[in-house]
Amino acid sequence: MQKVRLLVSGRVQGVGFRYSTYALALDIGDIYGRVWNNDDGTVEILAQSDNPAKLAKFIQEVRKGPSKWSKVTYVDVTMAN
């Protein structure tokens, strides 16, 4: 099981980003985790999958901004334990 932590910056709160991230994970499939807003305006995502290709696709799509109203400026990706 591969696990990652994504810290997403930009216009990512109040624009449906968390819901769109959830929908993206369902659409790709085999992605599990959670997503929440931080007090500093960022969104944090913990995601895991047994399929590295699907996890890579998820990260790629988060970088694009899963919500049409969001504007992602930076995504910090780290391996999680």
Locate the predicted segments by residue:
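Intrinsically disordered, low-complexity, mixed-charge
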Residues: 1-81
